Amino acid sequence: MAIIMAESSYERRVKALYEKQIRMEALEAKFIKKVYKFNSNLLDVKEAACRHQRKVGKLQKVLMERREELDKRVSFIEELDRELEATKLRDLAMKDRIKQQKMLARQRKNEIMESIHTLSKTTETYINQDALPARVKGVTVLRGDKRNQLIPFDLKSTDVEGLDSLCQHLESLNVDIAQWQQLISLAMDVAMESRAPTTPPKEAANCNSIIEIDLTSPTCHI
């Protein structure tokens, strides 16, 4: 009887140990499964982190490129602003120079017109401005005690011989040739300037205040 009870107690202990081992193996398997799942999740997290890091790197690269492009555009705009300001200053300077040149031109023209008026009175010579610069047309008055003599002239502006002949003729009549030539030259300059930049007539293409006179035409008296 004692032997049977001893064996029964031994079986219970063995059975308890076996059941305990089974529970331990089940717990171990469950733990291993959890560890595997954790490692798998950790790997997924690491891969996701790597993908995110790569995206962040690409975004940073794009951001840096955009920033460099923006800096270049800002520099370009600043350069354009400087060029625009410089252009405005040049335009202002040019306008000022043009204004000064126009003022000087008006002043010079007024001085020339005054000189022409003075020389015209001094030499008693009156020029037809509308005929210039193609022709030199006018009349010189020689004052006399009893009567005045008119010497008309209607000349091309390119004949050297005509100029020489006219000068000799006027000089023989005691006309101040230097002042007379100066009058014609100034009148020619005014006519040339007033017609610039239009193309001058063919007759005046080589004009240098050179005139001619037809001495065969009769003089007039008053």
Curated annotation (Swiss-Prot):
Where is coiled-coil annotated?
Answer: 51-86
Question: Main localization of the protein?
Answer: nucleus
Gene symbol here is Spc25
Q: What does this protein do?
A: Acts as a component of the essential kinetochore-associated Ndc80 complex, which is required for chromosome segregation and spindle checkpoint activity during meiosis and mitosis. Required for kinetochore integrity and the organization of stable microtubule binding sites in the outer plate of the kinetochore. Participates in SAC signaling that responds specifically to disruptions in spindle microtubule dynamics. The NDC80 complex synergistically enhances the affinity of the SKA1 complex for microtubules and may allow the NDC80 complex to track depolymerizing microtubules.
Q: How does it assemble?
A: Component of the Ndc80 complex, which is composed of Ndc80, Nuf2 and Spc25.
Output a single Gene Ontology CC term carried by this record.
Ndc80 complex
Q: Which organism is it from?
A: Drosophila simulans (Fruit fly)
Q: Where in the cell is it found?
A: Nucleus; Chromosome, Centromere, Kinetochore
Question: What is the designated name of this protein?
Answer: Kinetochore protein Spc25
Gene Ontology biological process terms, A to Z? cell division; meiotic metaphase chromosome alignment; meiotic spindle organization; mitotic metaphase chromosome alignment
Question: What are the protein's UniProt keywords?
Answer: Cell cycle, Cell division, Centromere, Chromosome, Coiled coil, Kinetochore, Meiosis, Mitosis, Nucleus
Task: Indicate yes or no for the key word Acetylation.
Answer: no
**Please, which domain of life does this record's source organism belong to?**
Eukaryota
Q: Which family does it belong to?
A: Belongs to the SPC25 family.
Is the Ribonucleoprotein keyword given for this protein?
A: no
